[in-house]
Amino acid sequence: MHFNFSERESELRKAGVEAGILCHALSFEECWKIAATQGLVASIVPAEFGGPGLNAIETAISIEGFSEGCKNGGFTFSMSAHLLAGLVPLVKHASGDIKRRILPKVVAGEYILANAMTESGSGSNAFGMKTTAKADGDNFTLNGTKIFCTNASIANGILVYAVTDEAKGFFGGITCFFLEKEKHNYTCGKPVQKNGLHASPLCEVFLTDVSVSKENIIGKMGSGVMVFLESMNWERTVMSAMHAGTMTRLCNLSRAHVKARMHGETALEKHQGVQFRLAEMFLQTESCKLQAYKAAKMIDKGEDVTAAAAKAKVFSSEALNTIAKEALILHGANGFTADYGIGEIIADAQAALIYSGPNDVLRNLIASRLQ
């Protein structure tokens, strides 16, 4: 594993930071256009469909840079969810027809994706779902309700996971379907009011006798578990890099503040207690980056990244919460004001402990794979 970026990787990170900075105080739609122009919303789309064709490590580096530059955590999360839980399954498993129709639109910034997995009765047991897809000739009829669907209300397409064979259960009994807003009559509930990630839309998705062609199956019949787990490995890996980008911004803000802030005739940075806090912030940020990059490299090498991705997500989400609170302390009363934005990051960071799998559930997964 190398520890120095190539020239291309350095350029990707720099472009990500610059794109993030450009998004300051802009609307969701304006931010999406900027991210699309930089190839961020379609990073993994192959060149044959007009995309950048980035691999996992390049995608992680790009998103890390964007997260460092962009102060809108909700938008960064929505873009990442679109990319990792939505686009990864399409690029890896969709039919040639779907790829030819949809991927160029994603590259152009004209198509947003969402994922519909979670249900109210299943909680962290995502595959205890009740949503069904009943075969009807060349079509399937979907019925059920999905909750906590990021981007669903603004999405042009949604990946829906449903039970197609209850007897087969976890492996072989769940299938992923691609529903298109223009073709399929699913409906979205009212926006969920959240404590953080305010720019990221969240809602329920209602499926009532929604008819979808078998051609819209992503992967193979009954392969929904594998499709979903692969996307979660990507999501946990790249969102760990996303967390690291936000942490880098917090570290740099805090360092600049304690260098400039005087206590009497001495800058705050000269006090040992402040130095300890700052050093710990940078230590945890560097550790997060290394874990995220390691997992991304494993994806690119075709290795089993399940445990590494879970480790990166658990560590980075908890470190993000710690560092955000440390940044507030180092900024003193200023850190508690809205102008500095640290309180908003603290609120956003709470969600990181839950999305992509709650950390305690991921700890169980990690423990089950100890050698």
Language-model regions, residue ranges each:
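A short, Trp-centered hydrophobic/proline-enriched beta-strand micro-motif
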Residues: G109-T118
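Flexible, small-/acidic-enriched active-site or ligand-binding loops
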Residues: G128, E182-S213
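Short Gly/Pro-enriched turn/cap motifs at secondary-structure boundaries
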Residues: G121-S124, F148-N151, A167-K168, K194-P201
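A short, charged helix-loop
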Residues: C203-E230
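Conserved hydrophobic/aromatic beta-strand scaffold that supports enzyme active sites
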Residues: A114, K130-T132, G157-Y161, C176-F178, ...
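Alpha-helical interface subdomain recognition
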Residues: M1-G73, M79-A81, H93-I98, K105, ...
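A short core secondary-structure module
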Residues: N143-C188
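Well-ordered alpha-helical segments within folded domains of soluble proteins
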Residues: H82-L87
